[in-house]
Amino acid sequence: MMSQGVTVTVRLVRSFEHRNFRPVVYHGVNLDQKVQEFIMQINDDIPQRASLPQPFKKHSYDTLKVIHQPHGAKTNELVVGLEDDERLILAPDRTLRDAGVAHETELAFFCHKDYQIYKANPVSKW
């Protein structure tokens, strides 16, 4: 069964410390594709977006994490929450649907290494 495409907002996180991020909205996302396929699709799309500043286009992104599910409560964290990584970071070999992505889900897209450094010392610099 083919899924209908859904709308997903992806927050490109360039810097956790400086709270530097840009949201990008994707329409028609197939929930039956693997997380890794969606990551490749986003990475291919980012350099083509005229609305994104160069630093966002050149940054390395490799990890998706659920920020907000539709009809759920939002966290107070301005960039991305640091809790529940096991549940909220999307495993590359699962489908988006199996990972809990639905219509109007918000995801953070970031460099996992940067996230680990920030998580060890979550201090904002602005």
Swiss-Prot record:
Pfam families: DUF2340. InterPro entries: UPF0538 (IPR018794). Belongs to the UPF0538 family. PANTHER family: UPF0538 FAMILY MEMBER, UPF0538 PROTEIN C2ORF76. This is UPF0538 protein C2orf76 homolog. It comes from Xenopus laevis. The lineage of its organism: Eukaryota, Metazoa, Chordata, Craniata, Vertebrata.
